[in-house]
């Protein structure tokens, strides 16, 4: 039992590292490097290829996180009865886990908006030209930038909640 629990926790942590680590790598390392890459068309190609690849990897990691998260909760004694009676939510563990789950849900929504709406729109705008496109590009970049910052903050808070649960 202990080995399987530890294995599930390890897989959960590794999937989280892939998701959050990838987000931080793109924001802190890749985007600043791409801004200096010449010619500009190469930036678009690298960003598009990387975004497409990371989108697939990150959503697989998210699926693994969700499955292992449920298994971890069950292994820690969370029951449907405790949830339905409200007993779960009155405990320290329940309050922290609920906070973590709300943050993860917010991250999932923000990630979906980024990956399936704003990110593809940004790639499309980077490929087009013209004054109107430039203004839309700047606006979209700001949205993507703020969305990434908020998601990163939520990611840090999720890790803080995980530490409090350990």
Residue ranges and their predicted role:
Residues 1-166:
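Polytopic transmembrane helical bundles with strong interfacial aromatic enrichment
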């Amino acid at each position: 039992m202990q080995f399987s629990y530890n294995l599930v926790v390890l897989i959960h942590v590794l999937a989280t590292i892939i998701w959050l680590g990838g987000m931080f790598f793109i924001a802190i390392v890749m985007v600043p490097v791409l801004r200096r890459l010449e010619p500009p068309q190469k930036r678009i190609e690298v960003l598009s290829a990387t975004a497409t690849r990371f989108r697939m990897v990150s959503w697989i990691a998210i699926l693994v996180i969700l499955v292992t998260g449920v298994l971890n909760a069950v292994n820690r004694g969370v029951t449907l009865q405790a949830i339905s009676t409200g007993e779960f939510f009155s405990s320290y563990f329940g309050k922290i886990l609920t906070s973590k789950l709300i943050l993860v849900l917010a991250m999932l929504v923000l990630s979906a908006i980024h990956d399936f709406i704003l990110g593809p729109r940004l790639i499309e705008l980077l490929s087009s030209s013209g004054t109107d496109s430039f203004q839309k590009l700047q606006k979209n970049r700001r949205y993507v930038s703020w969305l990434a910052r908020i998601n990163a903050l939520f990611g840090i808070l999720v890790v803080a909640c995980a530490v409090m649960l350990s």
